[in-house]
Amino acid sequence: IATDAFLGVHASHSYIFAIILSPVGSYYANGMDPVKIYIEREYVRCVKGGTGMAKAGGNYAASLIGQEKADKMGYAQVLWLDGVERKYIDEVGAMNVFFVIDGTVITPSLEDGNILPGVTRASCVEVLKANGYKVEERKLSVDEVKEAHKNGTLTESFGTGTAAVISPVGEYIDGDEHLVINDSKIGPVAQFLYDELTGIQWGKKEDKLGWIVKVN
């Protein structure tokens, strides 16, 4: 939080850095039940060269109108597209996003700097690779996802984040098109990741990746 005693527009020279710890329940009211996601075509969350890669309060301001649209239509979150072509997938409002297409787990790459490099995202990529899954971090268009849904190779989609951990996606809505995934049921990859991550966090599974640090 900026603390300069100044009224105007400039970067602050002093700040308060605070960490808040609080017990929480499931991020979504229905827990691990797959959610419905609205694909936003009109508004964008951020653009290349901006602050999309940062956990900054200002990034949320740009997402509010799109999220209000989704709320009114009964959808849990917004799938944001790139700010130039409105073609490539960035992320979901509160999560990074993954797709399982033809056995490969795909998540949008971070190269353009407009996607938050989430810790849970990175953890999932590491766990998947360590367990023999094929993982690709690359540009992924909505059209490619639609084609995979059409030909039956899109078998799963899920979001990842600190609050939600793993959130299965049961349906994407793009205008009049409804892309129902895995009969709106949680898929095996999402379930595996949730079990692995929470198992390591709670000490119920062996930490083979060296994440756990003993605090004296």
Language-model-detected regions and their locations in the chain:
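Short, glycine/charge-rich beta-strand/loop segments that flank catalytic centers
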Residues: 1-5
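Helix-start/capping segments and mature chain N-termini
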Residues: 7-216
